[in-house]
């Protein structure tokens, strides 16, 4: 599959930033897809999150620990990555 995650890379260890009010921040994940018109369905730890068209970038707020991120296009092609939130 030619599609790939721009961020996060496989097995990345990520520290979420703190917001100005001290609350937990977000991670922004991004996918490069070979078809610019594709619809992407995003899943974090096998739970559907959202879908994107045109710009394949979303923000997530996962709990500390290991996570699996999977993107599925409208044709059923999938690409996955694993990352760790510290």
Which role fits each region the language model picked out?
Residues 1-86:
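Soluble, non-transmembrane domains of envelope/secretory-pathway proteins that act on or interact
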